[in-house]
């Protein structure tokens, strides 16, 4: 969490995720995984001093956070970050995080269901954790990297 002034919110979500996994509560895991992604995005935007609407929907929030550290489609930095293959993987990570939001809307905590939900298994919980991990690690490692694209160009505009 290098460079994040107050990573406490991330640690809270990680602790809740761990407990929900231990308790075999896939709905709670899915909800917490989505919240971890949102929290990571907002913390990075705060660190970069980028304004955002706290009620911003997930897709624009993630895009804004990715753009703030140079992980957007239009980034033309020299080096490997410019490669189509790298950008394709980065886009995939963003899509994975969006899939997590959609899974949470259907099965996770945060929206009261009109009927009993069924079918979720531990494997779905683990999938949600891995989706959140992929996106959050990508964001946090890029944010803390001394050679990350955002350190060499003005991306706040």
What are these model-predicted stretches?
Residues 1-29, 39, 43, 149-157:
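Charged alpha-helical initiation segments
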Residues 5, 50, 77-80, 110, ...:
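Long amphipathic alpha-helical segments
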Residues 9, 28-32, 40, 57, ...:
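Residue-level detector of well-ordered alpha-helical segments, enriched
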Residues 12-19, 79-85, 113:
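Short, charged/polar, low-complexity loop and linker segments
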Residues 14, 18-21, 40-44, 69, ...:
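A structural signal for well-ordered alpha-helices, especially hydrophobic packing surfaces
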Residues 29-32, 43-61, 149-151:
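Short acidic alpha-helical/loop segments enriched in Asp/Glu that coordinate divalent cations
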Residues 49-93:
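Short, charged amphipathic alpha-helical segments flanked by flexible coils
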Residues 86-150:
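Charge-enriched, short contiguous segments at helix-coil
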């Amino acid at each position: 969490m290098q460079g994040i002034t107050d990573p406490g919110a991330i640690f809270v979500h990680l602790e809740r995720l761990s407990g929900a996994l231990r308790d075999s509560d896939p709905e709670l895991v899915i909800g917490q995984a989505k919240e971890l992604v949102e929290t990571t995005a907002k913390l990075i935007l705060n660190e970069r001093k980028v304004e955002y609407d706290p009620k911003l929907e997930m897709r624009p929030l993630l895009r804004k956070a990715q753009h703030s550290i140079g992980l957007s489609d239009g980034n033309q930095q020299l080096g490997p970050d410019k490669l189509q293959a790298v950008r394709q993987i980065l886009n995939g990570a963003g899509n994975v995080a969006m899939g997590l939001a959609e899974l949470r809307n259907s099965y996770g905590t945060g929206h009261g269901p009109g009927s009993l939900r069924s079918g979720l298994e531990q494997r779905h919980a683990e999938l949600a954790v891995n989706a959140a991990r992929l996106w959050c690690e990508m964001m946090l490692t890029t944010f803390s990297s001394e050679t990350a694209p955002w350190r060499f160009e003005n991306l706040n505009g």
